[in-house]
Swiss-Prot record:
Residues 623-632 have a biased composition (Basic residues). It is a multi-pass membrane protein. Its main location: membrane. This is Bestrophin homolog 24. The gene is best-24. It comes from the Eukaryota. Pfam families: Bestrophin. GO terms for cellular component: chloride channel complex; plasma membrane. Forms chloride channels. Keywords: Cell membrane, Chloride, Chloride channel, Ion channel, Ion transport, Membrane, Transmembrane, Transmembrane helix, Transport.
Length: 632
């Protein structure tokens, strides 16, 4: 019978599996005890002969044999062979159990579709399922020793009630050398056809449903017969059995304790009893016994299939289904949860145990409170950032408002807040850049040239004049998508040499003393939803804060410079007015106004770079970011 130990291991505890070691039926001890006893007896005999019966010369010869066997014991690949063999046997055993044959579906379909409360309808239902179970009995008689002992002849099958005497006569009329498992199935199909003709089965579809379940049951039994007919090739079990037993026969010599003083392989400790070799014998021999017991699960081992119990279960249950269970559904009434919220009940003891319902691991993560909208944009693809054939085509953008119910009101982790808060951070950076530089509107739906399109004309700053060089080409000292700022040698200096206060756009001048240079401030300057801009924002967000800091430092230094220049000019003006008097005051004022316009401090003539230098490989990977040509 099958040894059931599921209750003993239902709860995992440190001593759970150790309790299984105390069981005898179906255990590893019962499987290997005989072989282990024989091996230990032979080992003891050889040890006694070596220690007492051999002279010194013979002992040296015996010790050399021990050394030879021990050094070459690894030549037998025991782990490899046992691993593959046990895997093949376990897979075969699992499939045989899946198709062993449970007749429940046939009983349910027959009770559902073979209608009628008459005695004739009842006989149709009972005989259809009984014939199917009769076929299973005939199959198990030929493949299971336990079932064969139960039903040694067909007369015993008739006596058990699975076959009627007149049915046995009809069965015996068919005489040929092959098995006749198909006969009961043919009888069952004939009954379904007759029931359809007499109207007991209401439609052809219902007849097909019943017949399909019978066919599935028959197919499973056919596969069981096939597996019994063609087992695993006999060479494989022979090879494994030979390897395991040969290995431990060699161990009888290889694992002997060498006690001679002059021996090179003298054992450090003479334990007399081979402890480690005994453990190895139990493991390897037990491993092989597992495969041996599962090789044919229809035998009489402790853990083989309970074919007789399955036959009893099937015939009892299926007759109950089609007879007493037929058309006896309870009256249709309102359930206890009618118009009420379902609240399952527990026993008082189990109600205190918390449950872990089926729920996504991140289903409780919500948006932070400071996120009010989410901008949905197409995915940026480096390989094809723009739509082929339409490089200026704008992508579809959707802004989704965030409902209060979608926001989190508690702390859900720093990582979530940081990742979702980047939207607000980018918006704040964009506003700072807009205030610092008077550039075109960032959200421009027209298809004109902007910073982000990488088509901005090259610009040049020289003193108080700035040129736009139309048609200039990119070179290695300039970039697009940039912020342009001129500064002095060092913002940390107290005074910066300059001659004018604010840069102005000039026309038509090229070739200044200090050629115009600029650098990248990242694509946050433009938010036109292009693929290049979206990709740069995500990759270069860490550069923004240093750039903003440098811009603010530059503005602060420029403001201090203008204040100092104006203070000096005011002092000079007051001194001159005191010297010349009131008569020439009006003329002096006019001259001073002109002088102030000429001497107004301009931005530093030496360019000041903002941003982080891009690598040469990155410039080549993005053609639209290649630097423009130098001014001539």
């Amino acid at each position: 019978m099958t040894i059931n130990y599921n209750l003993a291991v239902s709860t995992s505890k440190p001593w759970t599996l150790f309790k299984l070691l105390l069981k005898w039926r179906g255990s590893i001890w019962k499987a290997v005890i005989l072989e282990l006893a024989v091996w230990l007896v032979l080992y003891g005999i050889l040890s006694v002969i070596y220690r007492t019966a051999l002279n010194p010369g013979q002992q040296r010869t015996f010790e050399r044999i021990v050394q030879y066997c021990d050094s070459r014991l690894s030549y037998i690949p025991l782990n490899f062979m046992l691993g593959f063999f046990v895997t093949a046997v376990v897979n075969r055993w699992t499939y045989l159990y899946q198709i062993i044959g449970f007749i429940d579906n046939i009983g349910l379909m027959a009770a559902e579709y073979v209608r009628g409360r008459t005695e004739q309808a009842r006989m149709y239902r009972r005989n259809i399922v009984r014939y199917c179970e009769l076929a299973q009995v005939l199959v198990f008689r030929d493949i299971s020793m336990r079932t064969r002992r139960r039903f040694p002849t067909l007369d015993t099958v008739v006596a058990a009630g699975f076959m009627m005497p007149h049915e046995k006569d009809r069965f015996d009329e068919i005489q040929y050398k092959y098995s006749k498992y198909w006969v009961p199935f043919q009888w069952a199909f004939s009954l379904t056809y007759e029931a359809r003709k007499k109207g007991l089965i209401e439609s052809d579809y219902y007849q097909v449903v019943v017949q399909d379940e019978i066919k599935k049951f028959r197919t499973g039994l056919a596969w069981i017969c096939n597996y019994d007919w063609v087992p695993i090739p006999i060479m494989y079990p022979q090879l494994v059995c030979l390897a395991v037993h040969t290995y431990f026969l060699v161990c009888l010599l290889a694992r002997q304790y060498v006690v001679s003083e002059h021996a090179d392989n003298k054992t450090e400790i003479d334990l007399y009893f081979p402890i480690m070799s005994t453990l190895q014998f139990i493991f390897y021999m037990g491993w092989m016994k597992v495969a041996e017991a599962m090789l044919n699960p229809f035998g009489e081992d402790d853990d083989d299939f309970e074919c007789n119990a399955l036959i009893d279960r099937n015939i009892t249950m299926v007759l109950m289904m089609v007879d007493q269970g037929y058309d006896r559904a309870p009256d249709l009434k309102r359930d206890d949860f009618w118009d009420e919220e379902v609240e399952p009940l527990y026993s008082e003891e189990t109600a205190k145990i918390p449950n872990n319902p089926l729920k996504g691991s991140v289903s409780d993560v919500k948006l932070p409170e400071y996120v009010h909208e989410i901008k949905m944009v197409p995915h940026c693809d480096d390989a094809s950032p723009l739509v082929p054939g339409d490089e200026m085509r704008r992508r579809r953008v959707s802004v989704v408002p965030v409902k209060p119910s979608d926001q989190q009101h508690h702390h859900h982790g720093h990582r979530t807040r940081t990742s979702l808060g980047n939207i607000e951070m980018f918006r704040s950076f964009k506003n700072k850049i807009e205030r610092s530089f008077s550039k075109p509107h960032l959200h421009d739906d027209l298809g004109r040239k902007t910073f982000s399109h990488g088509m901005l004309e090259n610009m040049e700053f020289e003193g108080s004049n700035t040129n736009i060089a139309d048609g200039s080409h990119a070179n290695n000292n300039s970039f697009t998508n940039s912020a342009f700022v001129n500064s002095g040698e060092d913002l940390s200096n107290k005074r910066i040499d300059t001659s004018s206060s604010q840069p102005q756009l000039a026309t038509g001048k090229r070739g200044s003393e200090h050629p115009f240079q600029h650098h990248v401030l990242d694509d946050v300057l433009e938010d036109d939803e292009s693929d290049e801009n979206q990709l740069t924002i995500r990759k270069k967000s860490s550069v923004l804060q240093p750039a903003i800091t440098l811009v603010e430092r530059f503005n602060e230094a420029t403001g201090q410079l203008e204040t100092e220049v104006k203070r000096d000019e005011k002092k000079k003006k007051e001194e001159e007015l005191r010297e010349e008097g009131d008569n020439g005051k009006e003329e002096k004022d006019n001259k001073e106004d002109k002088k102030e316009e000429q001497d107004r401090p301009s931005r530093p003539t030496r360019p000041f770079f903002i941003g982080v230098v891009r690598s040469e490989s990155e410039d080549h990977s993005h053609p639209h970011l290649r630097p423009p040509t130098k001014f001539e």
